[in-house]
Amino acid sequence: MDIAFIIDPIASLDPGHDTSVALMEAAQAAGARVWVTEISQLLIREGQVWAALTPIQLSPVQLVDGQWQIPQPWFELGALEWRPLNTFRAVWMRKDPPVNTAYLYATYCLDLVDPQTTLVLNSPAGLRHANEKMYALQFTSVIPKTIVTADKQRIREFVQQQGMAVLKPLGGKGGEGILFLQAGDRNLNSMIEISTQRGQLPVMLQEYLPAAKEGDKRIILLNGEPIGAVNRIPTGDEFRGNMATGGRVAAAEITERDRQICQTLAPALRRDGLYFVGIDVIGGYLTEVNVTSPTGVREIDRLNGTRLGQQVMAWLFS
């Protein structure tokens, strides 16, 4: 059984952090032969999608005294081969954002993979449909007060009404470009103009949730069901808890409120073929739905002694 992973260059991944590596290790442990490729290596010929793929053998990380120990080298590559993606049991689309033109074109290629032979996850159509900031807006009962606009006056009014707000670019990742806005800040107009490219680019504004100081919970969902969570806590003067911005991680429980949020999302996630998802929850409110390359599995496994990748593969092969 062969499984393909469409990823960023393998040497750029961090095996002690990247969920893609955890999934590849789990697939290998389950007896699958793992192959890797990149979006630039896709080909359509006679209506069939091919890829230049490389088989990979991984040396799994080991948990020692609460930390991941990484073997060196941690992977070994075989010979490059061109293969139709229809010959794989599953194809994981795990290319990191941004969702740019090249990314979108790759999803159109993946539309041609035969669903009778191969599961593509997440669904290419679902990836196009689910902007990671805006997808949450359909679930109005579980999100904080939110607007999306490029209009400076509307943004100023929202900040004035809330007192404090968080501005998010619609295409960012890892906390990039997120700003804390406060009524009365003399730099407010400048921050709005820069973020919206002088009113040409819409951004998201959400009410500031004081619970953010206590952490931003990442919950991993598999086919709509929560399977693990980790809390990401801001450090120093930083208001963002993202691991990419230096947030520290702590073990987290999946609460009844978290389960209610997941139940609210589950039908839409299943409808859109979004099988492996990471949602962000602050103070009992859904703030983002991460579908492109959600992370957090390594941190959850390290803090809880779990192996979520094994659970994912058991579902995939069932």
From Swiss-Prot:
Gene3D superfamilies: 3.40.50.20, ATP-grasp fold, A domain, ATP-grasp fold, B domain. ATP binds at residues 159-215. Binds 1 Mg(2+) or Mn(2+) ion per subunit. InterPro entries: ATP-grasp, ATP_grasp_subdomain_1, Glut_synth_pro, GSHS_ATP-bd, GSHS_N, PreATP-grasp_dom_sf. It catalyses: gamma-L-glutamyl-L-cysteine + glycine + ATP = glutathione + ADP + phosphate + H(+). Pathway: Sulfur metabolism; glutathione biosynthesis; glutathione from L-cysteine and L-glutamate: step 2/2. Its cofactor is Mg(2+); Mn(2+). Keywords: ATP-binding, Glutathione biosynthesis, Ligase, Magnesium, Manganese, Metal-binding, Nucleotide-binding. GO terms for molecular function: ATP binding; glutathione synthase activity; metal ion binding. Its EC number is 6.3.2.3. The keyword Isomerase does not apply. The keyword Secreted does not apply. Mg(2+) binds at E288, N290. Residues 133-317 form the ATP-grasp domain. GO terms for cellular component: cytoplasm. PANTHER family: GLUTATHIONE SYNTHETASE (PTHR21621:SF4), RIBOSOMAL PROTEIN S6 MODIFICATION PROTEIN (PTHR21621). Belongs to the prokaryotic GSH synthase family. This is Glutathione synthetase. The gene is gshB.
